[in-house]
């Protein structure tokens, strides 16, 4: 129902407009207050790059974070990642992830990023605290924040907004009448706009999510996704239909799909009933990190990687880090 309202296909959004005006007024005031210095913000000694979005729901931020981290590592830089850790509940913050950290503690996306990239990852409600914890523990030269575009308490040097190219901004209204955390004109002040699928507009960078090889959660076996035969797909992400459609576009024959809420916690029983005849069950890599400890032989996940048509973002971020490092070096002389 909420997707229908946000897409502009229902007039029910009119009932929610008073709440949206309030949300928008608070959002605008907070950003203005930070710009004027009425609310304090903290500046990191190393560059901070924010990968965020203007809308609620999944847009492809995490694959962009992983892509950027991997590219920076390949160039010899030392990146780390901070996150709010949505869906996780830790006894203490900031929390530095380790190989044993579970999604229930740190959140599914931070755990996924940690295992995919191997770089230091920290989570905390205050991203500034997470950055400070990382800098106290590691020698770093850049921080990437997964989400956090609206977390103005942490100053940033470069802003990347990721847009779902198919849904874009829906009806354009602030939450809850629409999907917007901030209005579309906010794009005028960011450094880069990446569009995940769909058509790009002027000055936007096209991105696709590529992945053809499924991995078995239980055994680690790898197999072409099309070789799994008739399968069931499940997803607990911001926009599950995108995942289901991508599987069908790759030629996967889906006999059923099951959408869960984003950041859902799963049980063995509720997933087993999805495949009563032991059909292959395909899930996202984000879901897989939460199901690994009770995985079954017929469970598979599909890793995907972001592919950008334009590498200007990487070049600009690399130059940012290089310039900051040179400045620090010169000041020490």
Curated annotation (Swiss-Prot):
Catalytic activities: a lipid A disaccharide + ATP = a lipid IVA + ADP + H(+)
Entry superkingdom: Bacteria
SUPFAM superfamilies on file: P-loop containing nucleoside triphosphate hydrolases
Molecular functions (GO terms): ATP binding; tetraacyldisaccharide 4'-kinase activity
Xref: InterPro entries: LpxK, P-loop_NTPase
Catalytic activity, EC: 2.7.1.130
UniProtKB keywords: ATP-binding, Kinase, Lipid A biosynthesis, Lipid biosynthesis, Lipid metabolism, Nucleotide-binding, Transferase
Annotated binding of ATP, by residue: 55-62
Keyword Protein transport applies: no
Short name of one Pfam family: LpxK
Any single GO CC term annotated in Swiss-Prot or TrEMBL for this entry: plasma membrane
Pathway named in the protein's UniProt entry: Glycolipid biosynthesis; lipid IV(A) biosynthesis; lipid IV(A) from (3R)-3-hydroxytetradecanoyl-[acyl-carrier-protein] and UDP-N-acetyl-alpha-D-glucosamine: step 6/6
Function: Transfers the gamma-phosphate of ATP to the 4'-position of a tetraacyldisaccharide 1-phosphate intermediate (termed DS-1-P) to form tetraacyldisaccharide 1,4'-bis-phosphate (lipid IVA).
Protein family according to the UniProt entry: Belongs to the LpxK family.
Name used for this protein in its record: Tetraacyldisaccharide 4'-kinase
Record organism: Proteus mirabilis (strain HI4320)
């Amino acid at each position: 129902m909420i997707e229908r309202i946000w897409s502009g296909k229902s007039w029910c959004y009119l009932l929610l407009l008073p709440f949206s005006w309030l949300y928008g007024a608070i959002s605008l005031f907070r950003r203005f207050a930070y710009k004027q210095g009425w609310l304090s913000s903290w500046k990191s000694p190393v560059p901070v790059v924010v990968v965020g979005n203007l809308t609620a729901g999944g847009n492809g931020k995490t694959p962009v974070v992983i892509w950027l981290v991997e590219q920076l590592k390949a160039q010899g830089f030392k990146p780390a990642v901070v996150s709010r850790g949505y869906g996780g509940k830790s006894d203490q913050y900031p929390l530095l992830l380790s190989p044993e950290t579970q999604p229930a503690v740190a959140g599914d996306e931070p755990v996924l990023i940690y295992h995919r990239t191997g770089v230091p990852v920290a989570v905390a409600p205050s991203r500034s605290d997470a950055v400070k914890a990382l800098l106290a523990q590691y020698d770093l030269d850049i921080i990437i924040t997964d989400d956090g575009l609206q977390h103005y308490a942490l100053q940033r040097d470069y802003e990347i907004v990721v847009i779902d190219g198919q849904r874009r901004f829906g009806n354009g209204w602030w939450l809850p009448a629409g999907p917007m955390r901030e209005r579309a004109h906010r794009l005028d002040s960011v450094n880069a706009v990446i569009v995940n699928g769909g058509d790009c507009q002027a000055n936007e960078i096209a991105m696709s999510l590529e992945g053809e090889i499924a991995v078995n959660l239980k055994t680690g076996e790898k197999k072409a996704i099309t070789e799994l035969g008739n399968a069931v797909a499940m997803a607990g992400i911001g926009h599950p239909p995108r995942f289901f459609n991508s599987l069908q576009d790759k030629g996967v024959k889906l006999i059923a799909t099951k959408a869960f809420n984003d950041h859902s916690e799963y049980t063995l029983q509720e997933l087993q009933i999805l495949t009563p005849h032991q059909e292959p069950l395909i899930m996202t890599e984000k879901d897989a990190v939460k199901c690994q400890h009770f995985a079954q032989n017929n469970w598979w996940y599909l890793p995907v990687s972001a592919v950008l048509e334009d590498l200007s973002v990487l070049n600009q971020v690399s130059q940012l880090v290089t310039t900051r490092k040179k400045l620090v070096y010169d000041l020490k002389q």
